[in-house]
Amino acid sequence: MNNKNHLKIATRQSPLALWQANYVKDRLTALYPDLQVELVTMVTKGDVILDTPLAKIGGKGLFVKELEHALLNHEADIAVHSMKDVPMEFPQGLGLSVICKREDPRDAFVSNKYRSLAELPQGAIVGTSSLRRQCQLKSLRPDLDIRSLRGNVGTRLSKLDNGDYDAIILASAGLIRLGMAERIASFIETDISLPAAGQGAVGIECRVDDELVQSLLAPLAHQETTICVLAERAMNNRLQGGCQVPIGGFAQVKNGEVFLRALVGATDGSQIIRAEGKSAVENAEVLGVQIAEDLLQQGADKILKSVYQD
């Protein structure tokens, strides 16, 4: 940072990524009126390869690596991410500074013809880029024709509007943030479609030795969201899952305890393994590991191994 009054935010160029970066910018400038905040936009591997399902591209950090290079090269001071895209392991010298307050974590059912999953006719075509959503949909409705759907939110909605799909499944948070909540035909409750770890939360990454930036970011942290996302990510990490695997994890804080539900599913929906538990909030990450161990004891590793081999 130059003279402690200029901060650069690395961000992807999609409308949702820019919304998230501007959200952080607005929070910071409200706190520090003399701070100049600049967005540095860039394209990631996940943005470029749009003709291949995410799970087939391979690797972790498809939407963050280029942003991390900018941090390491001092071309930016912070990077703003959707938490569900952030790998557990960070490059040396970088780390997660804060997790902001979570938006609605549920999946959204979006259709121009039908109001809910239950209304979909036999063999309806449903678009999703997520193996997690696919396995839960297939378990609930084996008759559905699940097809890959890539691109930013606007692109996906256009494909629906063009008649390529009867319905598509998106994260509610993205639609709400982009002012498109009216496109949500219905919210899919978490007992029907368990969200991805970190879904709906925004995280900020920075250089670990940049104490000034860390102190500037500290007021943006949301304690309850942080507890929940840390539990979810600890579970995901123990399962060695990235963001392109059929793993769901969702935590909630109630009465001073954190409750975590998680699942691992075969992509065809033929098998879904579930686990849940609770602990004191200070043990959120320990709980995440325990829930993952429960899933592994039930055979989650065999399911995940078959997914990686596909």
UniProtKB/Swiss-Prot annotation:
Q: What is an annotated GO biological process for this record, any one?
A: protoporphyrinogen IX biosynthetic process
Listed pathway(s): Porphyrin-containing compound metabolism; protoporphyrin-IX biosynthesis; coproporphyrinogen-III from 5-aminolevulinate: step 2/4
Write down the top EC class of this protein: transferase
Highest rank taxon of the organism: Bacteria
Per the entry, the cofactor note is: Binds 1 dipyrromethane group covalently.
List required co-factors. Answer: dipyrromethane
Q: Reaction catalysed?
A: 4 porphobilinogen + H2O = hydroxymethylbilane + 4 NH4(+)
| Residues carrying S-(dipyrrolylmethanemethyl)cysteine | 243
Annotated Gene Ontology MF terms? hydroxymethylbilane synthase activity
Looking at the UniProt entry, the stretches that span the membrane are none
| Any GO CC annotation of this UniProt entry | cytoplasm
Going by the UniProt record, its keywords in alphabetical order are:
Porphyrin biosynthesis, Transferase
Task: Look up the EC number in the record and give it.
Answer: 2.5.1.61
Q: Partners and quaternary state?
A: Monomer.
What is known about what this protein does?
Answer: Tetrapolymerization of the monopyrrole PBG into the hydroxymethylbilane pre-uroporphyrinogen in several discrete steps.
Name of this protein: Porphobilinogen deaminase
Q: Which organism is it from?
A: Mannheimia succiniciproducens (strain KCTC 0769BP / MBEL55E)
Q: What's the name of its gene?
A: hemC
